[in-house]
Amino acid sequence: MTQPCIISVAITGSLPRKRDNPAVPITVSEQVESTQAAFEAGATLVHLHVRNDDETPSSEPDRFARVLEGIRKHAPGIITQVSTGGRSGAGRERGGMLSLRPDMASLATGSVNFPTRVYDNPPDLVDWLAAEMKAYAIKPEIEAFDLSMIFQAVAMQQAGKIDGALHIQFVMGIKNAMPVDREVLAFYVHTLRRLAPDATWTGAGIGRDQLTMARWSLELGGHCRTGLEDNVRLDKQTLAPSNAALVSQVAALCEEYGRPVATVAQARALLGLPSMEIDGRSPW
């Protein structure tokens, strides 16, 4: 059977504002509604940042708690993944929401240049975030911005800092970081298969490269990420009307490439996560 494709939706991010696209969900209710619609369109994993009311990035655990509660109610079974990225807090503040026990959390295993700053991930912070994820039984999604981050993730797994099979997200298209290049992506995938044969991976392209990365990921056996965090446009002329519209676009690509869109149960099994119910009870 052809492997199903997990569609991840990054609904908000830290950067897009309403002025960029009015559909960017900012409030708790907007984020819950946007996730529900994306879920109904085929997304089985939601990547979460939260915002303050003035649209600035936040790492406030209470806000994460309210979003997670709403998503678990209105998109039952969807894989919840919180961001520990550096725009919404400093140091250990970035992991303040991990005690809420989402299914997954992002973990960058090294530092990288971004358009106007360094995305700083010093080893002691990376180790602390990984330890918190392990303590709360949260599966990390390794954010790989270059090749070294794959090797670092494997080393952390071998040292017992990360449990279970790795899940890597290859991020391409951020200015000053790795550009979108199919040969590089293919080498990343080859390297990952050599170092961690049981690992899974997702491709994430930024802006106009979002669909290009989705196509390559489908061809190479990976999974796909979409959403207004990475790209506010449906095409060159059209703003995306919703996260659900972007998910539908990727779902159509899955059909084109003969990759069925993963169900919640399939996505959880592929990532080694608990099923929707444990002993007849919700895992939450």
Curated annotation (Swiss-Prot):
Keyword Translocase: no
Enzyme class per UniProt: transferase
Names of the cofactor(s): Zn(2+)
Catalysis performed (reactions): 3-oxoadipate + acetyl-CoA = acetoacetate + succinyl-CoA
E.C. no: 2.3.1.318
Keywords, ordered alphabetically: Acyltransferase, Metal-binding, Transferase, Zinc
Gene3D superfamilies: Aldolase class I (3.20.20.70)
InterPro entries recorded: Aldolase_TIM, BKACE
GO molecular function: 3-keto-5-aminohexanoate cleavage activity; metal ion binding
Pfam family name, one: BKACE
Family from the record: Belongs to the BKACE family.
Function: Catalyzes the condensation of 3-oxoadipate (beta-ketoadipate) and acetyl-CoA, forming acetoacetate and succinyl-CoA. Is likely involved is the degradation of 3-oxoadipate through an alternative pathway, within catechol degradation.
The protein's name in its UniProt record: 3-oxoadipate:acetyl-CoA acetyltransferase
Species for this entry: Cupriavidus necator (strain ATCC 17699 / DSM 428 / KCTC 22496 / NCIMB 10442 / H16 / Stanier 337) (Ralstonia eutropha)
